[in-house]
Amino acid sequence: VLIIAVLFLTACQLTTAETYSRGRQKHRARRSTDKNSKWTRECTRSGGACNSHTQCCDDFCSTATSTCI
């Protein structure tokens, strides 16, 4: 009887822990989405002026012509 009680309590704890971690994961995903929205940037399309590759949508800036390729 003691073994059955221990198994039952262990199963209850595992179920509760799994449900709790799923809830936390959903909030984590929402928080990271909000964080990413703050870091979104506008980019320059191909042919536009640029000073570095990070300004271009395709991440390539020609240093010879200072344009996004």
Swiss-Prot record:
A Gene Ontology term for the protein's cellular component: extracellular region
Signal peptide (UniProt feature, chain positions): 1-17
Protein name: Conotoxin Eb6.9
Family per record: Belongs to the conotoxin O1 superfamily.
Record propeptide residues: 18-41
Remarks, miscellaneous: This precursor corresponds to allele E1d or E1b. Has not been merged with other alleles since they may differ due to geographic variation (see strains in PubMed:19606224).
InterPro entries, A to Z: Conotoxin (IPR004214)
Tissue specificity statement from the Swiss-Prot or TrEMBL entry: Expressed by the venom duct.
Domain comment in the entry: The presence of a 'disulfide through disulfide knot' structurally defines this protein as a knottin.
Disulfide feature: C43-C57, C50-C61, C56-C68
Keyword terms, alphabetized: Disulfide bond, Knottin, Secreted, Signal, Toxin
Any GO molecular function: toxin activity
Native source species: Conus ebraeus (Hebrew cone)
